[in-house]
């Protein structure tokens, strides 16, 4: 359903009302076209090694939003793009030529970030409708649970004797994890005019991010020569911001948004088909957890979509495409089996997960109240993660949210997480009969994958999670 993207001027933007380009700028910002442009910029920066130039443009766009935007909603797509921007050639863990090292561009990136933050602070201080006391007083129903969760993170390892064993890293990691959950929710809840937001805006942000990563999968296959001797070598599926599991996670999370958008356009079958193709790209990440989540979440999203009889034709077309792909898979069973040999050989092999889960529970039994800290002492988890985990400031993680919480923070951390999760579950239930259900499904995909991986303790997916909660809580959706 088409919705107006024009908003009345606020006191802040009234001063620019007579400038025609500012009005056109705001119309662009509130439309899906802006998300498309940001996504294209991210693809170009990632595939062609132009990250520094792309970051510069993204920051300039962000400053344009901070200074001239009616609100800060368009920054959502910029935040996601900044995370998924780095390409293979700039992975700081694989090359010393990465732009993220100070001598190669790291200082410049920090300057860009500082400039963006300064403009954000300026807007919050000067704009009394979105900033100032109004910002602080905006209702944030999920905030209490997030603060409780943050306290649980910061107490992880207290009284275990390991809290400061790695210096301030344990506290710093806990703080970063808390900010990942809290910061975007806190900022956007107070800086967006939610009564004027089009209800499909986050769906466009999510779909843009998902398709961007799909393009990156193609780039990774070419750049890293992933296929040799007609076989996919899964260890080569890595980009500048994450490995195969990270890429698969982002794509799987965004599949519900393709289904959501299918009823908002007369070309709904296009979006439904995109959802099916995103499942295919998830398969080419060879991330087993992501593949499982992508298929399950697509099926559930499709079942919800079938409630609307207007969507059924589009979904029939999309599922016909899926059926055709399955038929082709059967016809070319031999070559496809060879192509995915490594994935098929893994099957349901836990690959040491069963070992580290047992060790994680033993760590919990040894430190039941506050856990051991985010920096494990047992050897098995480093064997699972790889040797590099012992040489980085980032801790090895337990690849299961519950065990991570118990081993790192004990029953206190798990209880704090439960408070936050109960609040989000209530929100999901409240929105279950509206189009907000697709945001709930995206978040559910993240939580399901995090039962076999460490995505809830990776910043990128959780930044989107934080924004999604703000959007879900505040927007009025169609039922």
Language-model features: where?
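Flexible juxtamembrane loops connecting transmembrane helices in multi-pass membrane enzymes
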Residues: 231-238, 329-359, 379-382
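Transmembrane alpha-helices of multi-pass inner-membrane enzymes
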Residues: 36-39, 256, 420, 436-451, ...
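Aromatic-anchored transmembrane helix interface
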Residues: 104-114, 141-153, 165-190, 204
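N-terminal signal-anchor transmembrane segment
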Residues: 3, 7, 23-124, 155-157, ...
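Hydrophobic transmembrane alpha-helices and their immediate junctions
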Residues: 311-315, 319, 408-447
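Alpha-helical transmembrane segments of multi-pass inner-membrane proteins
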Residues: 37-40, 62, 150-154, 158, ...
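A membrane-periplasm/extracellular boundary helix in multi-pass inner-membrane enzymes
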Residues: 217-220, 284-285, 305-346, 361-365, ...
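Long extracytoplasmic/lumenal interhelical loops at the membrane interface
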Residues: 346-358, 365-366, 370-409
């Amino acid at each position: 359903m088409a919705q107006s993207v024009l908003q009345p001027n606020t006191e802040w933007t009234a001063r620019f009302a007579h400038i025609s380009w500012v009005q056109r700028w705001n119309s662009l910002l509130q439309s899906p076209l802006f998300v498309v442009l940001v996504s294209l910029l991210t693809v170009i920066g990632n595939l062609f090694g132009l990250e520094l130039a792309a970051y510069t443009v993204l920051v300039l766009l962000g400053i344009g939003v901070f200074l001239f935007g009616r609100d800060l909603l368009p920054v959502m797509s910029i935040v996601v793009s900044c995370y998924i921007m780095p390409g293979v050639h700039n992975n700081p863990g694989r090359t010393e030529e990465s732009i993220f090292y100070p001598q190669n561009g790291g200082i410049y990136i920090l300057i860009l970030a500082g400039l963006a933050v300064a403009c954000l602070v300026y807007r919050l201080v000067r704009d009394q409708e979105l900033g100032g006391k109004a910002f602080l007083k905006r209702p944030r129903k999920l905030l209490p649970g997030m603060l409780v969760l943050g306290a649980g993170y910061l107490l992880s390892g207290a009284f275990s004797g390991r809290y400061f064993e790695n210096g301030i890293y344990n506290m710093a990691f806990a703080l970063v994890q808390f900010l990942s959950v809290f910061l975007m929710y806190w900022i956007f809840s107070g800086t967006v005019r939610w009564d004027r937001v089009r209800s499909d805006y986050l769906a466009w942000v999510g779909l843009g991010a998902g398709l961007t990563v799909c393009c990156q999968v193609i780039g990774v296959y070419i750049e890293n020569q992933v296929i040799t001797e007609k076989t996919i070598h899964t260890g080569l599926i890595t980009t500048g911001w994450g490995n195969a599991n990270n890429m698969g996670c982002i794509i799987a999370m965004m599949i519900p948004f393709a289904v959501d958008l299918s009823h908002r356009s007369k070309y709904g079958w296009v979006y439904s088909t995109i959802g099916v193709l995103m499942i295919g790209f998830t398969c080419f990440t060879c991330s087993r957890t992501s593949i499982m989540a992508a298929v399950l979440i697509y099926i559930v999203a499709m079942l919800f979509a079938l409630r609307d009889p207007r969507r059924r034709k589009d979904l029939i077309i999309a599922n016909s495409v899926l059926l055709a792909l399955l038929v082709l898979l059967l016809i070319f069973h031999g070559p496809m089996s060879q192509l995915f040999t490594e994935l098929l050989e893994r099957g349901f092999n836990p690959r040491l997960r069963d070992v580290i889960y047992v060790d994680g529970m033993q760590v919990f039994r040894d430190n039941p109240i506050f856990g051991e800290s985010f920096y494990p002492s047992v050897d098995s988890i480093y064997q699972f993660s790889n040797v590099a985990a012992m040489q980085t400031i980032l801790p090895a993680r337990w690849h299961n949210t519950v065990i991570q919480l118990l081993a790192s923070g004990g029953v206190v951390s798990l209880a704090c997480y439960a408070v936050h999760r109960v609040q989000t579950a209530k929100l999901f239930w409240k929105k279950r009969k509206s189009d907000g259900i697709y945001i709930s499904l995206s978040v559910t995909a993240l939580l399901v994958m995090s039962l076999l991986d460490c995505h809830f303790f990776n910043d990128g997916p959780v930044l989107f999670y934080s924004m999604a909660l703000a959007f879900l809580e505040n927007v009025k959706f169609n039922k």
